[in-house]
Structures are given as structure tokens and as C-alpha cells.
């Protein structure tokens, strides 16, 4: 969920995304912006999540924010952390970039438990390929891949993992 304080003229209101068209229209009516086209309004504050602070103090397209909110609501497991870490890594700060990133999280594996080399290899392949065979979970090739990934130096340690 995304919650922003939007401003139009001297009026402000909070709006949560994703939202229905009815909820969007009600919020726009509260600030007398129902006739604004294109639907770009000023964000005076990003209430939640703080990681989207890049949207604050700028004009944004509310339809794009709503679409991003829908994408973020569909995140599963650690995908939200993946999204925030990839966003920071790449320096993405525009809505089109953030929406695009939400469709490409498989390019940014996030491994939270780096104590087990086999688990690192399995999680990496699962993120990048989308699946791994269930019958060879204990195969040493995953531990070897995990060691190679750690030794490559390409991994970046973050507050949510590597």
C-alpha cells in the first residue's frame, strides 16, 4: 500500500493506493481537483512507505501511482524488500522506472540467509529462473554456485540481505 498527501491549490488530502475510481474521485473532490487533466498533482508528503520518499515534493500522475500500488500489493514474500533494494541500487526515482522495476524483480535476487551456501545457490536460481527441480534439493551444485556467487564480489550487502 502507498499513502500520499496530495496538494492542489491551498487544499491537501491523504489518499491510499491502490484505490478504486470512486475513492480517487472522492479524494479529488475534497481538494477541488476533480477536473484536473492530466491527473498530475503535487505530493507534499509520502506517508507510507518511506522508501518511496523520492515521490515527495514533485508532481506525479495519480493513475501511475495507483498502478504501482496495485503492482506492490501483488508482491509475494520478500519481493517488497527486493523492490526497495533494487530501487536504491539503480537509483530509480520516477514512476515509470518504478513500475518497470516491479515487473523485473527476477533481475535482482535478494538472499537473506547467507549462512548456508546451498541455500544461497538455490534461492539465486529460484529467483532468476523461477523454478528449480524439487528432487535435487541437496545437490552439491547449489553449494558450489553459492560459493561462486559470494566469491565473485558482485553481491551487495544491504539491510535486507545480499
Q: Residue ranges of each PLM-predicted region?
A:
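Generic alpha-helix signal with a bias toward terminal, lower-confidence helices
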Residues: 16, 26-29, 55, 136-137, ...
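A generic structural micro-environment signature
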Residues: 21-23, 49, 151
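Short, flexible beta-strand-to-coil junctions
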Residues: 5-10, 35, 46-48, 160
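Short, extreme N-terminal segment that most often corresponds to the first beta-strand
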Residues: 1-26
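Alpha-helix initiation and N-capping motif
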Residues: 21-24, 118, 142-143
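Mixed-charge (acidic/basic) macromolecular-recognition segments
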Residues: 28-131, 138
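Acidic, proline/glycine-rich low-complexity IDRs
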Residues: 122-162
Amino acid at each position: 500500500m502507498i499513502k500520499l498527501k496530495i496538494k492542489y491549490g491551498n487544499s491537501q488530502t491523504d489518499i491510499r493506493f491502490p484505490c478504486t475510481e470512486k475513492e480517487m474521485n472522492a479524494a479529488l473532490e475534497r481538494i477541488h481537483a476533480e477536473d484536473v487533466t492530466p491527473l498530475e498533482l503535487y505530493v507534499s508528503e509520502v506517508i507510507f512507505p518511506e522508501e518511496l520518499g523520492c515521490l515527495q515534493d514533485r508532481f506525479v500522475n495519480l493513475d501511475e501511482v495507483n498502478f504501482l500500488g496495485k503492482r506492490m500489493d501483488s508482491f509475494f514474500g520478500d519481493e517488497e524488500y527486493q523492490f526497495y533494494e533494487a530501487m536504491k541500487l539503480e537509483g530509480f526515482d520516477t514512476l515509470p522506472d518504478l513500475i518497470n522495476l516491479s515487473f523485473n524483480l527476477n533481475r535482482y535476487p535478494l538472499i537473506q540467509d547467507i549462512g548456508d551456501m546451498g541455500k544461497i545457490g538455490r534461492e539465486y536460481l529460484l529467483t532468476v529462473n523461477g523454478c528449480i527441480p524439487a528432487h535435487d534439493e541437496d545437490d552439491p551444485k547449489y553449494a558450489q554456485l553459492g560459493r561462486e556467487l559470494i566469491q565473485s564480489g558482485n553481491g551487495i550487502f544491504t539491510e535486507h540481505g545480499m
